[in-house]
């Protein structure tokens, strides 16, 4: 995030539009800085991208004093590129994970977070199939596993299937990949014992600060979902387990429509859209409770088919749909938005119309 700042030399005097951005953003950004010397632009931008992409990805804020922007300096024609720092499981960690899988009777895997890829998703599917692992997904991370797969168990968001909650509580091994297991997935921190789970707990996360932050893992692995998925796909097969029943529970939860009062039944609306739409449609939504019907009844099939906020920001759905339409113009995009949520960013309808995007707003 690049923000204009008052001129250098008058800061601290409450000049017109002066803001202490370090104080304002330090609680919600990974790094806040200011470029006071234009010669350092390549250095600071390279570091900013590295910080933003490494570990748990997050925002970086850079303030730009207005007088600094008017200076002329000689810089290289191409700025340096800083890739995200990658870490992978060690041989010892993989051996211990394999041993825990061999001993487990009722394991379950939970997928979440960011820094995934299509390759990682495919590798995790193969890993789950080889190990006969039921797979749940974290809050608004439903694109990470095909909902029609016989190992898919459901999502840990708002209005969770009680059968999934029971299955997790009775599990003897929980493997969380990329997920932090924060308020919504943990059902307001009631689903797992704190700080030590009664089950064996394997926590895989690219940010070391997240490992042991709330839950003490039996095995902590600092790795991105991509590097972990590619490392575990060829682990020895564990013994056969019965894993299909949890998918039948999911199907029952999403096929049986509860009776609701009123002329419009949103569960019927959602299942009708689901059954009549192409399987690769991209779904976006904002933060409101109206999204409960989307999360319960839509069956996500492909990676990249869901764009939704986990931070609780209203107004997210429409600009997300515009971005998806611009990025993948050949795809149909459905945006679900409540009235207040839509009005937060309703001006984006102009962009949608200007570019003639294949976006439908519900």
Where are these regions (language model features)?
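Short, well-ordered alpha-helical microsegments
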Residues: 117-120, 229, 291-294, 345-346
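Short, flexible loop/turn segments with low-complexity composition
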Residues: 61, 239-251
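Small/polar loops that bind or transfer phosphate-bearing groups
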Residues: 36, 111-112, 285-286, 308, ...
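Conserved structured core elements
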Residues: 118, 125, 223-226, 263-267, ...
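Short, glycine/acidic-enriched loop or turn micro-motifs at the edges of active sites
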Residues: 208, 289, 342
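Thiamine diphosphate
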Residues: 1-8, 31, 163-165, 170-183, ...
